[in-house]
Amino acid sequence: MGSRKCGGCLSCLLIPLALWSIIVNILLYFPNGQTSYASSNKLTNYVWYFEGICFSGIMMLIVTTVLLVLENNNNYKCCQSENCSKKYVTLLSIIFSSLGIAFSGYCLVISALGLVQGPYCRTLDGWEYAFEGTAGRFLTDSSIWIQCLEPAHVVEWNIILFSILITLSGLQVIICLIRVVMQLSKILCGSYSVIFQPGII
């Protein structure tokens, strides 16, 4: 009972993280609050991977919904035996928590790549990735940010928002990983038997 309540609390934490991921990803389409750059496709290419909107956002909301349903006491009657039902619920919980790790992990990786690549901006040489060849060193050298002439403050905009996405998706990965460990501990530590019985399956 205690582990189930704990699992439900962890699942609930995923909801605000997913909603914030959607909001932050949407903001990446509007550097400095302007819409013209999205319509003219003058944004960093990693924005178009929809890492925050789709994977760390919508897909995580779906995963969270399933996990919360599985935590409901009334959903332990999927077969004749209560023990059998618990086994299937545990298995499904592990599967969907693992999917959560995959979805949020995707957002984490893409956001990190977007952060290291730097923004797509207008320089004296035209529109380009001004810091693409710096291997992320520009992140700690604010003196070279002036190379980006347009959009205004786009370097800060990208750094802040991609960093937030990395944090949000990282927390999602941790929460889903904890859920997997909790469910596996039920099996390995013998909270209930997971030996399949021929007469049940």
From Swiss-Prot:
Sorted UniProt keywords: Membrane, Transmembrane, Transmembrane helix
Domain of life: Eukaryota
Topology Extracellular: residue spans: 31-49, 115-157
GO cellular component: membrane
Membrane topology label: Multi-pass membrane protein
Keyword Transmembrane included in the entry's annotation: yes
TM region positions: 10-30, 50-70, 94-114, 158-178
Keyword Transmembrane: yes
Residue intervals annotated with topology Cytoplasmic: 1-9, 71-93, 179-201
Chief subcellular location: membrane
InterPro entries linked to this entry: L6_membrane
Subcellular location: Membrane
Family to which the UniProt record says this protein belongs: Belongs to the L6 tetraspanin family.
Designated name of the protein: Transmembrane 4 L6 family member 18
Organism, scientific name: Homo sapiens (Human)
Underlying gene: TM4SF18
